[in-house]
Amino acid sequence: MDKSSGLDFINQMFPVEASLSCVESFMQKICDEIRRVDATILAVVSQQGNSGTRAKENLNDAICAAEELSHKIQEIKSKAEQTEAMVQDICSDIKKLDFAKKNITTAVTALSRLTMLVSAVQQLQVMTSKRQYKEAATQLEAINELCNHFKAYMDLPKIMELREKLKNIKQILKFHVFSDFSSLGTGTETEELFLLKKLSDSCLVVDALEPSVREELINNFCSRELTSYEQIYVGAELKTLDEIELIYNQLSCLIRKNQGKWTIFPASWHVPYRLCIQLSRKTRVQVESILVNLKEKSDVEKLLLELKRTLEFERELEMKFGGGGSIGDDIIGGGGNNSQKFNFRGMISSCFEPHLTIYIEKEEMELMQLLEKVVQEETWDIEEELGCHSENSVYLMLLDAHDMKMILLKVPSLARQPEASALLVKTATASYVKLVNHQMKRAEAVLKVIASPIVTVIDTYRALFPEETPMEFQRILVLKGLTKAEQQSILDDFNNHSSRITQLSVAAKTPEAHALPLALTNVAPAVRFKANSEEVLTRAASAATTSFMKLYALTGAAKDRPFRKLFNP
């Protein structure tokens, strides 16, 4: 406490002089307070000394407890290591026991399956001797399943012995099945019905054997069924078209007679289809031989009749044994597939195609005769009043040309077969459309120039025929029905304004209009490629004779004779 503070305290305690009378009592009070504080300090110091002693004792106790805990931890660690070693020993023993259990289980299972296999082979041997095909098929499937479990033990003597025994039993089964099939058709009707049921069961056995056995059985059966057909026609000298009908009748009779017998085979084998494929191939050879060996030119009507009968026969086969889908020439391989569909279109009838030339020649001859008739019936006197009738006729011919173009473009699809290759159809159709468009474009251009007014005929001609000559332009003016004076006036104007032509061509050229019939004559290959009957050619020829033939006749005659009323309604 500084001096000022002490003075302030004294002044506060003794503000007036009269208060100094209480100094002694005040001093006594202060002394008592000092003694109390000293006693408190002494008690605290004494207590603190006792606390240090207790703290040292507590520290010693804690050190002892820590040492004891460390000792116990060491003991626990030691016991844990001992326990771990014991567990490892136990696990090792358990693993050995697991391997032993697995080996024992495998051995027991293998022995059990071996017992079942031995028993099944013995039962199969008994069934084979009794020709119990249905039971043998089920047993053979079970044996094949059991044999799959012994693939890893094929070198064991017992397994090799069983395999050899099973192989011999399968050979015996195969022999019995083939023997029963060879006896088909040699017994009475009752015996045949019983044998058919038996052979139907034997097919189950063949399915359980190797695939090669099934193929061999099918080939043998087909060869046997074809024997009667081959005895009649193979090697025989066939010369006339009438014999084709006899062949189809014989085939239809053979199919009807044996169709019930073919049902013994599973559908997945496709035996009727494969048999009919072979029949169709042999028939194709015979029909082709007849067509090649014809000594004189065959009658078109009779040839088309036999072609129609061939197509009908193919449709009959397809309805009974096909279903549409893949190409008939593709013989199915082994194994079969229920999802496959087949057809017989074109297998026999395709051999007629090289011999249809006479039909095409006949159609061309009839078209040319009709063309000549149309030309001969026309008179070529000039009529001054032609006028609007000519223009109306030209517009009508433009419509006819457009309709004819649409008909020609539809020709490839009129009798298109659904199973034809998409790429082949697309390529053929594209080339055919290009040909028709090219040929018809020029015909339509000629008609448009003819239909144009006189004042714009030059501009129309230059726009549609930029590379043509005045000679071609003059011929179109003739077709337009103009007088010579009108033609000369227009030609002079054409030559004066032409930057490319300096003089009229006097060389004798074939008129371009003569190329127009190509749109008709080139239709024949496309029709032959896509159509199956003469209906398509008839429709195309009919359309051509209504309008396009008129244009062809007109352009051919316009070179030397004046225009008449060919365009009149």
From Swiss-Prot:
Subcellular location field: Cytoplasm; Golgi apparatus, trans-Golgi network membrane; Endosome membrane
InterPro entries: Vps53 (IPR039766), Vps53_C (IPR031745), Vps53_N (IPR007234)
Key words of the record: Coiled coil, Cytoplasm, Endosome, Golgi apparatus, Membrane, Protein transport, Transport
Chief location category: cytoplasm
DNA-binding listed as a keyword: no
GO cellular component: cytosol; endosome membrane; GARP complex
Membrane topology: Peripheral membrane protein
Function according to Swiss-Prot or TrEMBL: Involved in retrograde transport from early and late endosomes to late Golgi, leading to the membrane fusion between late Golgi and endosomal vesicles.
Protein name: Vacuolar protein sorting-associated protein 53 B
Organism: Arabidopsis thaliana
UniProt lineage: Eukaryota, Viridiplantae, Streptophyta, Embryophyta, Tracheophyta
